[in-house]
């Protein structure tokens, strides 16, 4: 059994790493990819808000995570598709995320959970497909890690690798965000 203080440190560290990686990715990509930078910034803000729960209610923290998932992740994929000429997929992902963000109050907790995981997996798969066709190795890793985060969140287990499941998902999301930031940079270099 893992002690409660260790769980708190693990949770805080996973939020800090996700916030740090996402902030670095936002700053790195702001000049070349404003949509992706906005998506990374939403991830950063959601992770930081979760670190200071005394400033907000639990519902505010969940709302921030919801927005980072259903708007932030499609923003990340939007630019990846747009630059490769797949404008219809880019618009469909972003439009679907916006509709889900507005409909979040009507879905209920279970519906929001399923919709958030679906958005994560759809974004991961579409990034992976584009990365395979463009031979972007970082994009493949980013899509795979985002997919791992989505699949791990569906597991029934409370703990994975001696850590709380949510922490492992945040670590996978941070790794996917880092790889995706590198993929955007690689993609921009190929097009210039």
UniProtKB/Swiss-Prot annotation:
Q: Which keywords does the record carry?
A: Membrane, Signal, Transmembrane, Transmembrane helix
Primary localization: membrane
Output the Gene Ontology cellular-component terms.
membrane; nucleus
Compartment(s) = Membrane
Q: Where are the transmembrane segments?
A: 35-55, 63-83, 92-112, 114-134
The record gives the membrane topology as: Multi-pass membrane protein
Signal peptide (UniProt feature, chain positions): 1-32
What top-level branch of life does the organism fall under? Eukaryota
- Designated name of the protein: Transmembrane protein 276
- Give the lineage: Eukaryota, Metazoa, Chordata, Craniata, Vertebrata
Q: Which gene encodes it?
A: Tmem276
């Amino acid at each position: 059994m893992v002690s409660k203080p260790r769980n708190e440190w693990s949770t805080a560290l996973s939020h800090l790493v996700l916030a740090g990686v996402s902030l670095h990715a936002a700053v790195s990509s702001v000049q070349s990819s404003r949509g992706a930078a906005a998506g990374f910034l939403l991830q950063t803000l959601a992770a930081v808000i979760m670190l200071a729960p005394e400033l907000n209610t639990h519902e505010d923290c969940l709302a921030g995570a919801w927005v980072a998932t259903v708007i932030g992740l499609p923003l990340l994929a939007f630019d990846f598709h747009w630059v490769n000429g797949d404008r219809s997929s880019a618009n469909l992902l972003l439009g679907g995320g916006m509709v889900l963000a507005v409909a979040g109050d009507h879905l209920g907790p279970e519906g929001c959970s399923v919709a958030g995981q679906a958005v994560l997996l759809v974004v991961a798969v579409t990034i992976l497909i584009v990365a395979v066709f463009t031979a972007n190795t970082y994009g493949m890793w980013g899509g795979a890690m985002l997919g791992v985060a989505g699949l791990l969140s569906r597991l029934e287990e409370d703990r994975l690798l001696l850590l709380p499941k949510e922490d492992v998902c945040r670590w996978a999301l941070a790794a996917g965000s880092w790889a995706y930031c590198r993929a955007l940079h690689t993609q921009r270099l190929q097009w210039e």
